[in-house]
């Protein structure tokens, strides 16, 4: 069902989003004031990204992670979890680690690599790959760093014993020798992507983030054979930002909340659809196209405050205030209609470094309202 037409202008939607999203202290230079800047700050962005980079498709792993978390995808029939099973907040089930930010970071090294010469004694060239980590905030804690390599084999058949992959810290200057080897692993075949876990090898779990990660790679056949060519390198980085992770956060419900219509009536959630196209962010927000933010509106007078109006029961304090207001209107104000149940959303977008980022934001959707 297409989203309903909205009356508020884009500026009002930006202001609403800026109020909904958490305000995070950044260590970088302050951004200009205003609703748009406040929302960009909450998204962890210094400036508004320019849009999707040319010839930069969204990696399939990022689509899979997003679709598993998006409630619209699960309701449309592409459910990746069993009915009744809820996703643990601030946890990436597919990778088995804690986290609420997933980045797919491409290699910023040489854009093209020439074919490698044949090797008669296992001596093959090395490659240097560079990953830009400048967008990672100091408060983020790494939980997984997976190097993924795709090779174009010069020979159809794998050498006897396969290949050996070695990863070392690359030297900083031109012609500088690489540092000590961080890891070695056997690669039996080059058809599927070659993956190597770097966390604990490239840097310690509690170490400060480098601005970039430079690695020297070598793939040597264990028997005389032609060398392979490195076609693509990327880093899948999962981090946990505790500022965006609520210990008591509730998972998103599968069913849509019961929403009210007009402004009158009892306290309940009212429908509000926020479109990223309306605010001009569709060029760099990959998915979703928008989301139901909703808002609370309605009366909390008796008997609504006693019944809970179909939502959660009102607090005893709210009932007491409603009783006092009914007996003596000047003695106490009516309770307020406020969110009683909130749920998160996941946003897939390009950041300022053209990385594909999947980020979860808590308390973005009003599911239920109550008198407080």
Swiss-Prot record:
Changing residue 262 to S: In a patient with Rastelli type atrioventricular canal. It is found in: Secreted. Residues 30-253 form a propeptide. Glycans are attached at residue 206. Keywords: Cleavage on pair of basic residues, Cytokine, Disease variant, Disulfide bond, Glycoprotein, Growth factor, Secreted, Signal. Disulfide bonds join 267-337, 296-369, 300-371. Residues 67-86 are annotated as: Disordered. CDD domains: TGF_beta_GDF1_3_like. Expressed in the brain. Its main location: secreted. It comes from the Eukaryota. GO terms for biological process: endoderm development; in utero embryonic development; mesoderm development. It is linked to Conotruncal heart malformations: A group of congenital heart defects involving the outflow tracts. Examples include truncus arteriosus communis, double-outlet right ventricle and transposition of great arteries. Truncus arteriosus communis is characterized by a single outflow tract instead of a separate aorta and pulmonary artery. In transposition of the great arteries, the aorta arises from the right ventricle and the pulmonary artery from the left ventricle. In double outlet of the right ventricle, both the pulmonary artery and aorta arise from the right ventricle. This protein is produced by a bicistronic gene which also produces the CERS1 protein from a non-overlapping reading frame. This is Embryonic growth/differentiation factor 1. It comes from Homo sapiens (Human). The lineage of its organism: Eukaryota, Metazoa, Chordata, Craniata, Vertebrata.
């Amino acid at each position: 069902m297409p989203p309903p037409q909205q009356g508020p202008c884009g500026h009002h939607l930006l202001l609403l989003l800026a109020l909904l999203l958490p305000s995070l202290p950044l260590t970088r230079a302050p951004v200009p004031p205003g609703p748009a800047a406040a929302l960009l700050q909450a998204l962890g962005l210094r400036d508004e990204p320019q849009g999707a980079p040319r010839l930069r498709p969204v990696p399939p792993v990022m689509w899979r992670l997003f679709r598993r978390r998006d409630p619209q995808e699960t309701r449309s029939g592409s459910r990746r979890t069993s009915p009744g099973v809820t996703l643990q907040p601030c946890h990436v089930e597919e990778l088995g680690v804690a986290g609420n930010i997933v980045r797919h970071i491409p290699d910023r090294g040489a854009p093209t690599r020439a074919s490698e010469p044949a090797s008669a004694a296992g001596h093959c060239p090395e490659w240097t790959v560079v990953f830009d980590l400048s967008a990672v905030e100091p408060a983020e804690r790494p939980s997984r760093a997976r190097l993924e390599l795709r090779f174009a084999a010069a020979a159809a058949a794998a050498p006897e014993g396969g290949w050996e992959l070695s990863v070392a810290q690359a030297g900083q200057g031109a012609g500088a020798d690489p540092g000590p080897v961080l890891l070695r692993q056997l690669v039996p075949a080059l058809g599927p992507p070659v993956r190597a876990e770097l966390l604990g090898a490239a840097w310690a779990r509690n170490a400060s983030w480098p601005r970039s990660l430079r690695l020297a790679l070598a793939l040597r056949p264990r028997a005389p054979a032609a060398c392979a060519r490195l076609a693509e390198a990327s880093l899948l980085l999962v981090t946990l930002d505790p500022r965006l992770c609520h210990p008591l956060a509730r998972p998103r419900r599968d069913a849509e909340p019961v929403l009210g219509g007009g402004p009158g009536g009892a306290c309940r959630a009212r429908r509000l659809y926020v479109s990223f196209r309306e605010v001009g962010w569709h060029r760099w927000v990959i998915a979703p196209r928008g989301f139901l933010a909703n808002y609370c509106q309605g009366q909390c007078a008796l008997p609504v405050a006693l019944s809970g109006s179909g939502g959660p029961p009102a607090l005893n304090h709210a009932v007491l205030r409603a009783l006092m207001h009914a007996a003596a209107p000047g003695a106490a104000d009516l309770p307020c209609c406020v969110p009683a149940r909130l749920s998160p959303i996941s946003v897939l977008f390009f950041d300022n470094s053209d990385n594909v980022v999947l980020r979860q934001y808590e308390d973005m959707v009003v599911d239920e309202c109550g008198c407080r």
